[in-house]
């Protein structure tokens, strides 16, 4: 990061442990990271590992709290949008039909999730969490965002819940905190996200 100050953009698609560790060891690094796009959290959509928590944040809420209050420019791509982007079994079958090994690989690694959603939710496909976050970075115009401050609960019953104070509704003094405002995705043009992924698959997976 120090070789390319202000040029590092991070797309985080798992728990934020490693990023929090770096911040703890070298707090000045927050000044040279350009942005972090986080696949994690939830505003109004509840949780997917508990009634209130999304899995990536739940697995290390202490780390998530460190990252969210770091003042690094952050975009949160949570369940409010990823649960609206659905990769169908037909999409996965199409990927497997592409004349390259990558398409078959994507089918193989998706089968577990397809079976899981079929058994637990009677759905024919799977949510498209991680790739949605990546596309939010490359094509933010597919999303609507609100600004707010995000706090992460570490209490037993609400562990991992992301509590959002929307900037337009809550004055900073009300929450008595100096953390930066975060861009929180609250709407998505899901068809455009899927089509962009398929376009990339067709073009680059060779």
Task: Identify the residue ranges that each predicted region occupies.
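Active-site histidine-anchored catalytic micro-motif
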Residues: 1-84, 89
């Amino acid at each position: 990061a120090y070789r390319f100050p202000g040029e590092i953009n991070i797309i985080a698609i798992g728990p934020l442990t490693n990023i929090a560790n770096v911040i703890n060891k070298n707090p000045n690094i927050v000044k040279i990271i350009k942005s972090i796009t986080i696949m994690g959290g939830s505003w109004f959509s509840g949780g997917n590992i508990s009634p209130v928590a999304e899995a990536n944040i739940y697995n290390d809420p202490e780390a998530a709290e460190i990252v969210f209050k770091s003042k690094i420019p952050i975009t949160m791509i949570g369940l409010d949008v990823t649960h609206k982007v659905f990769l169908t079994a037909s999409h996965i079958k199409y990927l497997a039909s592409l004349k390259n090994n990558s398409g078959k690989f994507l089918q193989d690694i998706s089968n577990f999730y397809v079976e899981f959603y079929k058994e637990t939710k009677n759905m024919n496909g799977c949510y498209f969490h991680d790739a949605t976050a990546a596309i939010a970075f490359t094509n933010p115009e597919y999303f609507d965002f609100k600004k707010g401050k995000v706090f992460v609960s570490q209490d037993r019953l609400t562990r991992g819940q992301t509590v959002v104070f929307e900037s337009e509704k809550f004055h900073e003094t009300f929450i008595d905190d100096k953390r930066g405002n975060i861009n929180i995705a609250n709407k998505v043009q899901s068809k455009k996200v899927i089509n962009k992924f398929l376009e990339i698959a067709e073009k680059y997976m060779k």
